Amino acid sequence: MLKVIEHHSASAGNTFIDCPQMWIIEKIYGFETEENARMRMGHAAEEAAHHALVNQITDEKLIISDAKGKYIERCGKNGGTIDDEYEWTAQIANTFVKELKQYGKLIHYQREYNGPFKDLCLPVVAKTDFEFNDYIVDTKATAKVWRYAPTAAERHKGRKGRINHNYHPKPDHLRQQFLYRELFNKECLLLYASAWDHHTSDLGDHVGHLETLIQAFKSIEHILGIAKTKEDVVRMFPLTFDNWRWRYSPGAEAFARKIWHTAWK
């Protein structure tokens, strides 16, 4: 097998499923996507929520201050207080704290797994978000929680519209959490939060998501098994830029063009 990766992960498997070309430049050629405002928002809100839970902080103003500070720390010279995400981060962190408290005492944060998985040659690595006695909760900061417009009856009762399940839970999130349920032997939940709304999804009766992810891992191993060079892998896929991942990865398109040009010279 071509020795270019050491393990599988849900994030890498999802990238391969969505956009194998992006997987190639990231995992085989080492391209790293710069953290954008949405990514900073998610990381900062999660970190602030963890700090609040561990230290039993419930004062919303303190959580807001901490979340904004963590967002700025991640900005460096790029963006900052002018970003919409700067304000959103603070509200999302508060929502995370309020929702996560209902699950009881936090027993693990970012617990890791690194080990074998049935029928795979390479090990699988995983890292949880918030783990409680009964659940693992993966937090997802988002600009919008997607709902249908409320019906007249819902408006009359002061209720929001129903969740649009085309967006929540997302297939890649389900694939990850089904894998985590298998690895950590515990039920998993997805907590989506925007600055104005939130929604918690369980894995429900969705089927096939774990199998799809494992098949992606097997496909990766098959490709690396028949390829003799990195360029062989590149030549297996045409270079296209129609996947959404390219829009959020500055520099990735130019990097990929050079890789494909070199492989086909």
Describe the predicted segments one by one.
Residues M1-K127, K265:
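Metal-dependent nuclease catalytic cores that hydrolyze phosphodiester bonds in DNA/RNA
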Residues E26, L53, V145-Y148, L183:
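Active-site-proximal flexible loops/turns
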Residues F31, A143-V145, W196-D197:
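Short, surface-exposed beta-strand-loop junctions and turns on beta-sheet-rich folds
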Residues E46, D134, Q177-E182:
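Short, hydrophobic, well-ordered secondary-structure elements
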Residues E99, A149-P150, S201-L203:
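Short aromatic-enriched loop/helix-cap "lid" or pocket-rim segments at secondary-structure transitions
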Residues H108, E131, Y135-T139, C188-Y192:
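A structural signal for short, well-ordered beta-strand segments and their strand-loop junctions
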Residues Y113-Q176:
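Non-catalytic protein-protein interaction segments used by genome-maintenance enzymes to assemble
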Residues P169, L179-K265:
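Metal-dependent nuclease catalytic regions and adjoining charged, substrate-binding loops involved
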